[in-house]
Each structure stands twice: as C-alpha cells, then as structure tokens.
Amino acid sequence: MSMQDPISDMLTRVRNGQAANKVAVKMPSSKLKVAIAALLKAEGYIVDFAVEGEAKPELEVTLKYFQAKPVIEQLKRVSRPGLRVYKKKDQLPSVMGGLGIAIVSTSKGLMSDRAARKAGLGGEIICYVA
C-alpha cells in the first residue's frame, strides 16, 4: 500500500521519536521533506539532518532536547491532501503569539510565516511548529 501523505508521516515520526526520547529518526527522503528539515534546523527546532543512500535515499533527523524535554512541543499538519489550506500574505497565522512558526509553501519555496510576511507572499500552510 502506498503512503497517502508523506509529510504527515514525517511529522508523526518526529513526534513519536521525541516522545520516546530518541536521538534521531529515519524516514524516506524527498525534496519537500529535506526543505522542511532545513527550515526546522534554521529555526532551531532540530540539531541536524542528513540524507543517506543513493537508490532509496533516507532522511535522518537529529532531534533536539532542552533539559531533557523536547524542543518541539507541538507539531501539527494543517494543509493535507483531502483539505488544502491556502492563505494570503495578510492572513498568515501567528503560531502561539509569534513563539512558534507556520511552515508555508510559497512560489519562492518553503519558508516560515515571518519570512513569508516579510517577503509579501502567501501560500499553502504546511504545518505549525511550536
């Protein structure tokens, strides 16, 4: 059976890995997953990520903890295959009053809600991270 929503699978693996206090989690790789991991690293939610393998590349995400608690408190998928969610630049949500980020897929690539607002771009809301 094929995977219907690979992004939800990625977010669930990260959530489950942090709940089990894992150092890192592995998952099948794609360009979108690598872009999400790069954004999470840039925002300080994960330590690092790496793509391993050539024929079937795997993405390994190294999770981040602070005082033995996961840095990511909430990881929620918003736009999904059955219900896409698009927002204009002035309608982009503020997650936890600006303490979290919304990952937005824009015409200029994946970026945080703050970066999209600054660039004057709207797009598809992929997920919330807090």
Swiss-Prot record:
NCBIfam families: PRK00136.1. The gene is rpsH. Belongs to the universal ribosomal protein uS8 family. Disulfide bonds: none annotated. The keyword rRNA-binding applies. Part of the 30S ribosomal subunit. Contacts proteins S5 and S12. One of its GO terms (molecular function) is rRNA binding. Keywords: Ribonucleoprotein, Ribosomal protein, RNA-binding, rRNA-binding. This is Small ribosomal subunit protein uS8. One of the primary rRNA binding proteins, it binds directly to 16S rRNA central domain where it helps coordinate assembly of the platform of the 30S subunit. Gene3D superfamilies: 3.30.1370.30, 3.30.1490.10. One of its GO terms (biological process) is translation. The lineage of its organism: Bacteria, Pseudomonadati, Pseudomonadota, Gammaproteobacteria, Vibrionales. It comes from the Bacteria. GO terms for cellular component: ribonucleoprotein complex; ribosome.
